[in-house]
Amino acid sequence: NKNTFHAILDKNLESYDVYPMGVSGSPMSQYLAVAKYASERFNPKLFVFLIIDNDFDESFMKRFPGFHYFDKFNGLKLVNYEPSIVKRLARRSAFLRYLYIDLKWIKQLQRIFGSEVTTVDNKSNKNKEFLEIGRMANKKFLRGIEELSLTSHVIILLDGDRKAIYSGLDKRDKNKPVNTLYDELGMSAKNIPNVNVIDLHNVFKREYLLNNERFDFSYDEHWNELGHSIASQALTDKIR
């Protein structure tokens, strides 16, 4: 897709060849596995990692077989891929693939029809567990980044809290534990040599104050063309 941030980046940076190697649904643990492969095969000058909300806890949750996940005691562990009935059906239908991969329709149905009752204590415990898992993921991810930075430059791109921006908040919403993980990851990564951090929250906020245009689609939270364009420009400015 020529409108994705990596395609625009490839066009903007004539002296670089940009290769997107990410897979939809993969967490930061999988990012490191792919980066290790790329480092050994292609010896790139620069790695760019885009971190989004579900990267933290899903690095341990083993939600999607076929990916690498962090092991609590060791490094990365590959979970063998065994396609479910839904995925086998999705292979036969482009529409089902769209529902399953892009809109995560199973999760949406679970939210609508789920029987779980959320209490204050339950939410507090879930937030605490989320932070604990996320901090472990950050620690292991940064350890991998330190290794990569010995031979290559690294840019870590942090997605912005777009809902907070649309609501008029100046900073990330501190009531969302994922924003604590973003902040902690960014602060720690800045201390690693050859590593730069771009916090897209500030980039998106400046753009929204100027033009009052959303960076995502009305039906899901994926970036739209404007979101990709803004992210690619921030990367271009940093690399140049």
Annotate the PLM regions.
Residues 11-12, 38-41, 50, 148, ...:
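Structured segments of extracytoplasmic/periplasmic soluble domains
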Residues 163-240:
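Catalytic His-Asp segment of secreted/periplasmic serine-dependent ester chemistry enzymes
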Residues 14-17, 43-47, 150-155, 192-195:
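Loop/turn elements at helix/coil->beta-strand transitions in domains of secreted/extracellular proteins
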Residues 1-56, 228:
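Membrane-embedded segments
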Residues 28, 32, 135, 139-142, ...:
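Short, amphipathic alpha-helical "lid/cap" segments that border enzyme active or binding sites
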Residues 2-5, 33-36, 61-65, 169-172, ...:
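Short, glycine/charged-enriched secondary-structure capping and boundary segments
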Residues 53-187, 200-206:
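Serine-dependent acyl-ester chemistry module
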Residues 20-21, 131-132, 217-221:
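Second-shell loop/turn segments in exported
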